[in-house]
């Protein structure tokens, strides 16, 4: 039962260092394998309209990073798969669970993407289980990621249905207001929820939401994530699709949630909000900094590779120096 687990979030945890065994942090290997492919980092930009478009997806794939294209340009998905495959790049797309998506999946048989993410807010649902089974029947070689979920029961059910990985996180994101609108979610205890789910998982888990610092990537690995989905840290770059807005001479980029009125174009079942983020530099600079910080984390863990982070000790530090949403 959950009540037997300590409840904590990212800011409540500090990892405890081990003796360093590498001469330089540059020796630490940050690569991870998901399915049949290996990627430079265990992170994936959130599949949201203000985080990536086709050009950003292509840049990530060319650079050796994992990506998941969002599902909000439905007609563009098949041309996108062609565009990627024509360049020898992996195709990774998202689908929903509406009836017409079943026909869409059938259309992919001639040119199947390597990865499909079934992307709905409450992924522990019969509709998701049915879609997993459908994709596995029609496209047996495609790696299926399903989510989002927040309990071990959900992880087990989706894995048993055929999901190759599950995405854990209900509403902990910076522009997600599910917890406020519904009273449900993993906001405020996302890291404990990840740990709880990972103990039940037999397949990879993607931690999704609540990442505020690069150190949170190492903490996610420690508590069972194979890959970490990140929104706000990847938003606001020069290449990001969000609109650039000037306020008092300063440049900002918009960032909004996938169930916000800005994304939906209508105020109905809204569980996301819009914020403005100070415009950042290039996406590659952030990826490089994440890699260097993760290499440092691996060296503090006394390790040589990402998996070595899974074995470090930790302490729970309540009332820590940050508070979840405070600006760091």
Curated annotation (Swiss-Prot):
PROSITE patterns: IMP_DH_GMP_RED (PS00487). GO terms for cellular component: cytosol; GMP reductase complex. GO terms for molecular function: GMP reductase activity. It catalyses: IMP + NH4(+) + NADP(+) = GMP + NADPH + 2 H(+). NADP(+) binds at residues 205-228. CDD domains: IMPDH (cd00381). InterPro entries: Aldolase_TIM (IPR013785), GMP_reductase (IPR050139), GuaC_type_2 (IPR005994), IMP_DH/GMP_Rdtase_CS (IPR015875), IMP_DH_GMPRt (IPR001093). Belongs to the IMPDH/GMPR family. GuaC type 2 subfamily. Catalyzes the irreversible NADPH-dependent deamination of GMP to IMP. It functions in the conversion of nucleobase, nucleoside and nucleotide derivatives of G to A nucleotides, and in maintaining the intracellular balance of A and G nucleotides. This is GMP reductase. It comes from Streptococcus pneumoniae (strain ATCC 700669 / Spain 23F-1). The lineage of its organism: Bacteria, Bacillati, Bacillota, Bacilli, Lactobacillales. The gene is guaC.
